[in-house]
Amino acid sequence: MKLLENSSFEAINSQLTVETGDAHIIGRIESYSCKMAGDDKHMFKQFCQEGQPHVLEALSPPQTSGLSPSRLSKSQGGEDESPLSDKCSRKTLFYLIATLNESFRPDYDFSTARSHEFSREPSLRWVVNAVNCSLFSAVREDFKALKPQLWNAVDEEICLAECDIYSYNPDLDSDPFGEDGSLWSFNYFFYNKRLKRIVFFSCRSISGSTYTPSEAGNALDLELGAEEADEESGGGGGEGRAEETSTMEEDRVPVICM
């Protein structure tokens, strides 16, 4: 899996980390190519030792609704209903696991993840609604401006109408967002088989009482700031640094989500 550059996602991600007072929202959207090379090919061969690439694996029912995709199609009376709607091939499962590994490395390893920790979502509409409700409940009106920008960027990158959508719903022991203070989280994969690409949308809400800046990936910024402060401590740089930080805080704009 290779992370693909996307300037629109980078701009949106800068707005997906926001403090709401009671909680902190930390989110990101990333695009990955499913074309395997090097380590991916080696890992895929090992993965396929447990079953051939096209063998179907059972998935868990989706959490965005009370119906699985297969039951939904049956309830709607569709002639093309498929009893395999709640399954995916081992190759697709590998793509999902490899995306998690690439996105969360080096902090987490998902190589032992199993198919029951994933779900296939019933429809794009339900997923969009679930994401919008989570983000709107967290940041309210601030999300309205970001909402169309976010989904337009995702659609341009992955062509949502062609996607199968999966979610990662692990148990507490495996959940990278299962730490103390976690209020909610979601991990969605928008998989376009034709483009051989996955857009991964991950977001979580952390209680303000347990949140630390490093959880949002700011540890390096803090270290660099400390080094600069040490270098300037002899010439009044500390005071200038404090003024600069104050200005940055005043200019910071709350993140907007849809």
From Swiss-Prot:
UniProtKB keywords: Cytoplasm, Isopeptide bond, Nucleus, Phosphoprotein, Repressor, Transcription, Transcription regulation, Ubl conjugation
InterPro entries membership: Maf1, Maf1_sf
Subcellular location as annotated: Nucleus; Cytoplasm
A biological process term (GO) from this entry: negative regulation of transcription by RNA polymerase I
Biased composition, class Basic and acidic residues, residue ranges: 240-253
Domain of life: Eukaryota
Gene3D superfamilies according to UniProt: Repressor of RNA polymerase III transcription Maf1
Protein name: Repressor of RNA polymerase III transcription MAF1 homolog
Summary of the function given for this chain in its UniProt record: Plays a role in the repression of RNA polymerase III-mediated transcription in response to changing nutritional, environmental and cellular stress conditions to balance the production of highly abundant tRNAs, 5S rRNA, and other small non-coding RNAs with cell growth and maintenance. Also plays a key role in cell fate determination by promoting mesorderm induction and adipocyte differentiation. Mechanistically, associates with the RNA polymerase III clamp and thereby impairs its recruitment to the complex made of the promoter DNA, TBP and the initiation factor TFIIIB.
Organism: Mus musculus
Gene: Maf1
GO cellular component, one term: dendrite
Residue ranges, compositional bias (Polar residues): 61-76
Residues with PTM Phosphoserine: S60, S65, S68, S70, S75, S214
Positions of post-translational Phosphothreonine modification: T64, T212
